[in-house]
Swiss-Prot record:
Cofactor(s) listed in the protein's UniProt record: Mg(2+); Mn(2+)
Catalytic-site annotation from UniProt: 119 (n6-amp-lysine intermediate)
Keyword Zinc: yes
Name of this chain's protein: DNA ligase
Function text: DNA ligase that catalyzes the formation of phosphodiester linkages between 5'-phosphoryl and 3'-hydroxyl groups in double-stranded DNA using NAD as a coenzyme and as the energy source for the reaction. It is essential for DNA replication and repair of damaged DNA.
Keyword list, A-Z: DNA damage, DNA repair, DNA replication, Ligase, Magnesium, Manganese, Metal-binding, NAD, Zinc
Transmembrane spans: none
Key word Glycosyltransferase present: no
Lineage, broadest ranks: Bacteria, Bacillati, Mycoplasmatota, Mycoplasmoidales, Metamycoplasmataceae
Binding site for Zn(2+): 416, 419, 434, 439
């Protein structure tokens, strides 16, 4: 009896934990744990409930989160019943589990086929059309009732949420709203309030505004938030009641949706059998790190709709589809220590030392912890077991504790680990900064960034050599690098070891001095760079490579950049108030002004690869499909030719560069009269543009 009591208590504890996680995930857009930790806990609950169902009444079993979808709706949006339940998907974690699921379909239909596509980590949305017009947009909610977020769906770009379609029958389609990774990175420059792309997509889609304020100074924040809807994208994958539209398979329904102008994932396949399914899953798994959106597995569906009714469903998921989850990139290890490091902007990053463990083929001994709030939320404890995940990151992340603890036993770092200055919290309260401009670590990291590949690309000045130059008093700022040539005697003297005095006469025989001469040659070459590289190298907070390229269109040298009215850029090219404020703060800082004064004396010969005004660009390009080179390479070529690039098709788009497995852009380009070109034609255009 005592054992039963303990098991019941354990099940109740797991239920409460999952209910809390569901509320934070679905309603607050603030996930407390990683999906892999959530799935492990839910599976543990399901197993315990299966084996000990007799400990609960039928009503208690039905109220378990293992039997429900989503979370209770608590928002201010209108609550609307779904035409048919918006169910979740059952999960398979191994080939054996997938085979077991597929066996039931094979028993009903001997020649069953399957449809496979990536499982997008986004926000489920159901759209309703009458007479070709969008009239309703429901979130998943609790699976039975959803929130009608039509007012927000109407603000999303037509390419991703069609407001009008060429189909007059009543139609309901379901899909996923998401933010791609590169867009999320840009969004993070403007606000740090979103933890991940899914969190951002949910926060924007479910943003509630009960009125539109007057257009005055106080409404600026409202207008900025309204523009966030441009970040949202979509993939649609479900046609509700397909037989009503004479659609008999998932493959046909995807083509139907594509022809109506809905975004569908181009990375999908109709598979003839399970062997074909497993092969395609392997391909998706290999390529997922190269996708520009997050996936947490694949969805496998029975292709033939004719057997869906016989397959049936539970209250939580249908038997006609299953999610195959990737789980091999999570491991268990021991958290040995946590320590803080300082970056070039003074931002504090917490780092974890862990017991070495093999993960995704690599031996891992460290992990990243973004900030102290992350440590607090996960309730991480030193010398305890933790889960660690690697999904494309160079440095893996700790995603949760194996065991439950009431709080963390690691205290927040209050002083800079290098200069001991008191750390200051950001406005959001999430990040901490060292604001001592003379902090040796900040100075070091600024110079490291200045010399990095995407900035001045001075390979001979790696971090260890920069540390040595700082230690010996040979440099104190990035600009000093350009005057090392005037300090040769001092370099010979201070870099000589105790056993060998280096003089100017015998210096040529020294490998060390040869290395110095190589460095000086690289420094000289660095004077002939694209201006955007220097802007990026300045290390202005929130100004990344993309923003630096845009700034180089408005200024061709440091003097012009310093005199630029940055407020003119507000709400252009994704330049929001955070970037504008960072630019103004940087150029108003006395220490930065001294650095800029020094750099203006260097004698740079900047390449003029970018237009000073984007409105003068000779053409506008968009890209669809897989090309022979990485997409970033084509974007670089486009921009350096003086043309402009856009992720989406617009009225101003002149050319669509088409690769393999192109998506719906091709049909939209044809309708809009946009010229479609291949790679050969593209390079001919670029070549000819340089002649004019």
């Amino acid at each position: 009896m005592k054992k039963n009591s303990q098991i019941r208590a354990k099940i109740i504890e797991l239920r409460e934990k999952i209910e809390k996680w569901n509320h934070h995930y679905y309603q607050l857009q603030n996930p407390l744990v990683d999906d892999l930790v959530y799935d492990k806990t839910l599976r543990e609950l399901e197993k315990l409930e299966r084996e000990n169902f007799f400990l609960f009444s039928l009503e208690e079993l039905n109220q378990s989160p293992s039997q429900k979808v989503g979370s209770k709706i608590t928002s201010k949006f209108e609550k609307v019943a779904h035409s048919s339940p918006m169910l979740s998907l059952n999960k398979a974690y191994s080939n054996e589990e997938l085979e077991k699921w597929a066996k039931k379909a094979s028993e009903i239909l001997k020649t069953v086929t399957f449809f496979v596509e990536p499982k997008i980590d986004g926000i489920a949305l159901s759209l309703f059309y009458q007479n070709g017009n969008l009239i309703k947009a429901l979130t998943r909610g609790d699976g039975v009732f959803g929130e009608n977020v039509l007012v927000n769906a109407l603000k999303i770009n037509d390419e991703f949420i069609p407001k009008k379609i060429n189909y007059l029958e009543d139609l309901e389609v379901r899909g996923e709203i998401y933010i791609d990774n590169s867009t999320f990175a840009s969004l993070q420059l403007e606000t740090k309030k979103f933890k991940n792309p899914r969190n951002a997509a949910s926060g924007i889609l479910r943003r509630y505004k009960n009125h539109k304020p007057k257009i005055d100074a106080k409404s600026i924040k409202f207008l900025e938030e309204e523009s966030d809807f441009r970040y949202l994208k979509s993939f649609f994958y479900t046609l509700v009641n397909p037989e009503k539209h004479k659609i008999n398979s998932q493959f046909d329904s995807i083509n139907f949706l594509r022809n109506l102008g809905f975004q569908v994932n181009p990375f999908q396949k109709k598979c003839s059998d399970l062997k074909d399914v497993f092969n395609f899953i392997s391909i998706i798994k290999q390529k997922r790190d190269f996708l520009n959106y997050n996936i947490d597995g694949v969805v496998v569906k029975v292709n033939e709709f004719s057997i869906y009714e016989k397959l049936g469903s539970t209250s939580k998921f249908p038997h006609s589809a299953i999610a195959f989850k990737f789980e091999d990139d999570i491991a268990k290890t021991k958290l040995l220590a946590i320590f803080a490091t300082i970056g070039r902007t003074g931002k504090v990053t917490y780092n974890a030392k862990i017991e070495p463990v093999t993960l995704a083929g690599s031996k891992i001994s460290s992990a990243i912890l973004p900030n102290y709030s992350y440590i607090e939320n996960l309730k991480l404890n030193l010398n305890t077991e933790v889960y660690i995940k690697k999904a494309g990151e160079i440095i893996p992340q700790i995603i949760g504790s194996v065991h439950n603890y009431p709080k963390t036993n690691f205290s927040i770092v209050k002083n800079c680990p290098k200069c001991n200055s008191e750390l200051v919290n950001s406005e959001s309260g999430l990040d901490q900064f060292c604001q001592n401009q003379f902090c040796p670590e900040i100075i070091l990291q600024k110079i490291v960034h200045f010399c990095s590949k995407n900035a001045l690309n001075i390979e001979s000045l790696a971090q260890k050599r920069i540390e040595k130059f700082l230690e010996k008093g040979l440099i104190s700022s990035a600009c000093d690098i350009f005057y090392l040539k005037d300090k040769l005697e001092l370099i010979y003297e201070r870099l000589s070891n105790k056993n060998q005095l280096l003089t100017k006469q015998n210096a040529s025989q020294s490998m060390q001095i040869k290395s110095i001469m190589k460095l000086l040659n690289e420094v000289e070459r660095a004077k002939n760079i694209d201006f955007y590289r220097l802007i990026f190298g300045l290390g202005i907070r929130n100004v990344g490579l993309k923003a630096a390229k845009i700034l180089s269109r408005y200024a061709s040298n440091l003097s012009e950049l310093r005199n630029l009215d940055f407020n003119l850029l507000k709400n252009q090219h994704d330049f929001g108030p955070v970037i504008i404020e960072s630019l103004i703060d940087y150029f108003n800082n006395q220490k930065n002004s001294e650095q800029l004064n020094c750099l203006e004396t260097v004698g740079f010969n900047f390449k003029t690869t970018f237009l000073t005004n984007q409105s003068n660009s000779w053409a506008s390009f968009a890209i669809s499909g897989k090309l022979s080179k990485p997409r970033d390479e084509y974007v670089r070529i486009i921009e350096e030719s003086g043309a402009s690039f856009h992720e989406s098709l617009t009225k101003k788009t002149d050319f669509l560069l088409l690769g393999q497995s192109a998506g719906s852009k091709i049909e939209k380009a044809k309708k809009a009269g946009i010229k479609i070109i291949n790679e050969v034609q593209f390079f001919d255009l670029i070549k000819n543009s340089k002649k004019t």
